[in-house]
Design a protein with these regions (language model features):
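Walker A/P-loop nucleotide-binding motif
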Residues: 100-122
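N-terminal pre-Walker A segment at the start of P-loop NTPase domains
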Residues: 73-101
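Loop/turn-to-beta-strand initiation segments
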Residues: 134-135, 165-168, 197-203
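Short glycine-rich substrate-engagement loop in P-loop NTPases that contacts/grips substrate
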Residues: 84-89, 111, 126-165, 178-181
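Interdomain "pre-motor" coupling segment immediately N-terminal to P-loop NTPase/helicase cores
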Residues: 20-64
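Conserved alpha-helical scaffold flanking the Walker A/P-loop in AAA+ ATPase domains
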Residues: 96-99, 147-169, 185-193, 218
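Conserved catalytic network of the ASCE P-loop NTPase/AAA+ motor domain
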Residues: 100-102, 129-131, 161-164, 192-197, ...
Length: 247
């Protein structure tokens, strides 16, 4: 693959308000990173061929059945609740700049209470990556912990390789129960590998600032250095959308 000029995760951006056409009633003080234009000498970004967006590929993404129709189009069609408009605005800007985000390994840390659409929007981003012809994989922390403990060494190695090398990895529901010995070491190694190789990660968590007290500082530094932090506030929306798939 031809060489791709990359941009720094933290050094080469400024923040300023950006208004996205078609999104209304968004606070004007919302800010997001605006990245310098990367110099690309090929038609690929991290191995993603941008001319392959129309291809229909059957890939194993790990997306739970409950979320399998959570494309961005479907999410917008059913309506964005008022309490979610601010984080949705930031996420829509991330999607608008998706090739750049993947190019520099920029991810998202989605924080907030249960039922506030964190997982739904993470899956919507995954579908956008797949639409570019890229690879994406979803795994909940509960399933990851279970897999690390229960599968054979060969199966575990295969899973770890997949988690390391997909273009976008979604780690869902990072919580208190995973700050334990061997699992914590595995998670830290995974985060370190993807940080060093500029691979994007989206993490959802119900933890707020408590996360800083639960995970080793080195790992948290890497998450924050390569992620935009997006806070979701408000009551659970699951009852409101009970006729739809779960938030």
């Amino acid at each position: 693959m031809d060489q791709i000029g990359r941009i720094s995760n933290q050094e080469n951006y400024n923040t300023k308000p950006v208004i996205s056409e078609g999104i209304k009633d968004v606070p004007l003080d919302v800010t997001i990173p605006i990245y310098e234009e990367p110099y690309i000498v090929s038609n690929e970004v991290n191995g993603i061929n941008l001319n392959r967006s129309s291809e229909k590929k059957k890939v194993k993404t790990g997306i739970p059945k409950r979320y399998q129709d959570m494309t961005l189009q479907n999410v917008v069609k059913r309506g964005i609740p008022d309490q979610t408009k601010s984080p949705f605005y930031v996420i829509s800007q991330y999607i608008d700049n998706l090739p750049k985000m993947l190019n520099c390994g920029q991810g998202l840390l989605l924080r907030g209470d249960v039922g506030t659409m964190k997982t739904t929007l993470a899956v919507a981003i995954m579908y956008e990556v797949l639409g570019l012809g890229g690879t994406a994989y979803f795994i909940s922390m509960a399933n990851l912990m279970d897999s690390l403990y229960s599968v054979s060494q060969e199966e575990r190695q295969s899973l770890e390789n997949k988690l390391k090398n997909v273009d976008l990895l979604v780690l869902d529901d990072l919580g208190l129960e995973y700050d334990k010995g061997w699992v914590s070491v595995k998670i830290r190694a995974l985060i370190n590998y993807r940080f060093d190789n500029q691979k994007s990660v989206i993490i959802t968590t119900n933890l707020g600032s408590d996360i800083k007290n639960l995970y080793l500082k080195g790992m948290l530094d890497r998450i924050e250095a390569s992620s935009m932090i997006v806070d979701f506030r408000g009551d659970s929306l699951r009852e409101r959308f009970r006729s739809f798939d779960s938030m």
